[in-house]
Amino acid sequence: MDTTSRRAVPELGRAKREAMIECIASIRELAEINPAGFIKSEDKTVFPGIEPGTLEKFHARAKLLATPDAKPYLRAPVRFPAAELELFFDIEVDPMRDVCYLHGFVERRGADNATEQFVAFFSGEDTAESEEQAFAAAWRYLLASQPCAIYYYSKYERTIYRKLRSKYPHVCSEAEVETLFDPTRAVDLYCDVVLKATEWPTRDFSIKTLAKYLGFNWRDPHPSGAASIEWFDRWMTSRDAAVRQRILDYNEDDCRATRLLLDGIRALARQS
């Protein structure tokens, strides 16, 4: 790994890199500092816009990146909902067409991977009617699956469901959406767990990066949300069943990657 560039430290953006450049020019230098030497007061460091806790966080991440064979770890306790049924949830959206064209779920029972199955609700058209039908079907599925624990990665799913509720208010109410995403039953693994409670020896904390670190491989050679949008565009013009299946497979793999990450974090908790 290149340990000369600080760009590889997760969440260390350009403004913060520039604030530190005169004193700290590389990951290795950041890993070797004593953060206390740069702290001016309880809430300030010598670097504008960087608080002591933030500097200590970047220092810890740099140490992981600069250390051969470093392992991820928990820096805070984690708790997850107790549920027999777990749903791992991912959506696909075409922002140019302004359509949510796929709601995908991998369901697992009793923490047994042998029980896993993929459930998908696909909008085969870019029309409001088709989008609404897929959303309504996904919503009925979610209601029928209760009680369960829901896992997703980043705020995107919740944001899009709020938007869909506004577009199609008779499918569900605002209160029902907020209840669905209540953190006691629905967990944003990225914002509420990975960022708040874990550290990883990786350049970023994307689901692709962390799941690959844990050994997961996507079936598609070029997996990405942007690629899925391109495939949906091709589906719209070709109606090629193979293209549709490629979209579904990619979404299923994203859901399974989320499940693998949850299991990986649970393993870290058992080790700590």
Predicted regions and their residues:
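Acidic, Mg2+-coordinating catalytic module of metal-dependent nucleases/exonucleases
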Residues: 1-8, 14, 210-272
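Helix-hairpin-helix
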Residues: 2-60
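Generic beta-strand/beta-sheet core signal
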Residues: 33, 89, 108, 151-154, ...
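An acidic- and aromatic-residue-enriched active-site/binding cleft used to recognize and process polar
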Residues: 35, 92-94, 110, 155-156, ...
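Conserved structured core elements
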Residues: 10, 14, 24, 85, ...
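A contiguous, basic/glycine-rich beta-loop/short-helix subdomain that forms a polymer-engagement track
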Residues: 50-87, 91-92
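Conserved DEDDh/DEDDy metal-dependent 3′-5′ exonuclease domain
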Residues: 118-229
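Metal-dependent catalytic core segments for phosphate chemistry
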Residues: 81-86, 91-134, 140
